[in-house]
């Protein structure tokens, strides 16, 4: 009998390991979703003018018919006879006025025996199903008496739906957030020459009440750029964010602002960038209620005021800016105010640069996170006994999986675009002849080849290892990288890929919008592997390997080997499941 080729030996080893893993994996189909509760009323029937339209885990939303010239009317949210929150609803012309109650924490204290009502005076508004009250289906997690005690002690439901002290009574918050503001003010002024000033809810509280809004949850500031071109404004905002990170601040980039926290991540302020365009109109990425432009001749510069026990900057013509931001009813307190509902205009060209947001956010992530234990995917791949001589860890992060492959005898090259990740990986102290880490833009054509060409030649059998890489880059970058794999992979080389799969719902919108995270359809990856001449060893979807918080993440794994030319080894038994969710180690 002829000696087996190296690829055939790999297949045989992988087949045995695959069988062992498959026997250990238990598969279960997801439980069917419970049927939706039918509505009690005829959907074709006319709806009352004043009503509750939506009840969710986060909010209760509805409309109130008030009349054009009516005074603001108070609506109160009750659990049984306990008044939990109230809003004063200002008239909205001929149309009914919208209202909203934030309810995230309230539901912890309510169960099927409780009755939720929204009342104008003593009269309840009809619920979405037409009844005068709503009862939750889930059991209460805490006694209602605890909610009553917390409200009696002065706590309120803030604009996120959380129970907390009003910000004007929370001295600890005021001291810590104004200390952070002072540090950020100094840094921003040194970097770009501008002072951050109060805006949005913080400015509204300062102007209307002379203190922070009780129901607010953050500290809003902005700086006014001297540039008029949106691209120059965006570039300045990006430079500022990176410079603040270099000074030790935690900085997250969002579409409309940056979130800045101190080194201990105890408090946060939001920093927006404002600018006047060539037409002398103020441009705001977050937007304003008023759609009438705020013009440059209305801007009167900054002044220092006392706010939350500290000296801060605020616009001199503050009332005019507040009226632009919040509209003509800004003097009426409205804890249920909703930007999604009330916003009149926003300047999309003023948004923080989309291409730069993932760069800043991944840098911030690796500056403040470190992981010691290898991932379950590293255990899975190493357990297949593929025995590569070289592992190229693509998007290696802080190199948490590298020690596992080094212990198995492989040399590892870790590549990542984020400087903080590469520096963290290098601090692992692995021997340089066994592991090295380089910064590399894997989306750039030829970048991977350049890194491989710099290694001692000829290269041993290589495993291209990509955990959470294909679901963190754009479609175009993914196509570029797969083309690189196809061009570089030699007979006997291997590829291992793990990505979030279609159907995964654990990604926060911030991860999708600002970090480049996404889910990946495994079908094109499967087709590409076949078209590129790889033989698949593992093709498996599962939700038992990783969690986002307490929720399992739906993943898909591929491990494949490129056969040696001229050899025809038996196709290995594959670990595969597309419709079932398997437990993993």
Where are the regions that the model predicts?
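Helical scaffold of the NTase/Pol beta-like nucleotidyltransferase catalytic core
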Residues: 110-199
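Active-site nucleotide-donor binding segment shared across nucleotidyl transfer reactions
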Residues: 188-217
């Amino acid at each position: 009998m002829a000696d087996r080729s190296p690829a055939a030996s790999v297949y045989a080893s992988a087949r045995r390991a695959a069988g062992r893993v498959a026997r250990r994996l238990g598969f279960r189909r997801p439980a069917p979703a419970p049927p939706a509760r039918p509505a009690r009323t005829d959907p074709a029937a006319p709806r009352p003018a004043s009503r509750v339209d939506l009840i969710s885990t986060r909010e209760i939303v509805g409309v109130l018919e008030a009349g054009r010239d009516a005074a603001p009317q108070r609506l109160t949210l009750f659990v049984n006879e306990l008044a939990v929150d109230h809003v004063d609803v200002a008239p909205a012309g001929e149309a009914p006025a919208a209202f909203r109650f934030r309810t995230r924490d309230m539901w912890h204290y309510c169960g099927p025996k409780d009755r939720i009502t929204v009342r104008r005076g003593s009269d309840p508004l009809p619920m979405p199903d037409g009844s005068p009250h709503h009862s939750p289906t889930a059991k209460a997690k805490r006694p209602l008496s605890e909610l009553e005690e917390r409200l009696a002690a002065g706590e309120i439901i803030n604009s996120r739906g959380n129970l907390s002290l009003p910000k004007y009574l929370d001295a600890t918050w005021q001291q810590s957030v104004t200390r952070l503001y002072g540090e950020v003010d100094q840094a921003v002024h040194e970097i770009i020459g501008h002072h951050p000033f109060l805006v949005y809810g913080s400015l509204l509280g300062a102007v209307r009440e002379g203190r922070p809004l009780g129901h607010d949850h953050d500290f809003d500031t902005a700086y006014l750029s001297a540039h008029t071109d949106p691209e120059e404004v965006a570039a300045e905002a990006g430079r500022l964010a990176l410079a603040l990170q270099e000074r030790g601040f935690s900085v997250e980039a969002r579409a409309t602002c940056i979130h800045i926290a101190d080194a201990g991540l105890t408090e946060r302020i939001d920093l927006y960038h404002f600018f006047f365009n060539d037409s002398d109109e103020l441009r705001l990425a977050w937007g304003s209620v008023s759609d009438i432009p705020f013009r440059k001749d209305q801007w009167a510069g900054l002044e220092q005021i006392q706010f939350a026990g500290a000296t801060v900057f605020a616009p001199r013509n503050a009332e005019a800016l507040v009226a632009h931001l919040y509209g003509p009813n800004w003097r009426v307190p409205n804890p249920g105010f909703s930007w999604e509902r009330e916003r009149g205009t926003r300047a999309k060209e003023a948004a923080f640069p989309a291409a730069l947001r993932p760069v800043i956010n991944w840098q911030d992530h690796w500056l403040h996170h470190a992981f010691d234990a290898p991932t379950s995917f590293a255990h899975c791949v190493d357990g297949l006994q593929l025995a590569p001589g070289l592992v190229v860890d693509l998007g290696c992060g802080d190199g948490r999986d590298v020690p596992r492959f080094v212990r198995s005898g492989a040399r590892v090259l870790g590549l990542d675009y984020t400087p903080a990740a590469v520096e963290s990986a290098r601090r692992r102290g692995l021997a340089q002849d066994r592991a090295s880490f380089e910064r590399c833009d894997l989306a750039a054509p030829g970048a991977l080849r350049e890194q491989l060409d710099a290694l001692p030649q000829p290269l041993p059998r290589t495993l291209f290892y990509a955990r959470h890489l294909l679901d963190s880059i754009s479609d175009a970058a993914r196509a570029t990288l797969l083309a690189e794999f196809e061009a570089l992979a030699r007979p006997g080389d291997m590829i291992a890929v793990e990505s979030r799969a279609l159907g995964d719902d654990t990604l926060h919108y911030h991860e999708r919008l600002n970090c480049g995270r996404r889910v990946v359809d495994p079908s094109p990856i499967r087709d590409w592997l076949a078209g590129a001449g790889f033989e698949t060893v593992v093709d498996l979807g599962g939700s038992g390997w990783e969690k986002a918080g307490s929720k399992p993440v739906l993943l898909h794994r591929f491990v494949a080997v490129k056969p040696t030319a001229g050899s025809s080894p038996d196709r290995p038994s594959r670990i595969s499941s597309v419709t079932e969710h398997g437990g993993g180690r």
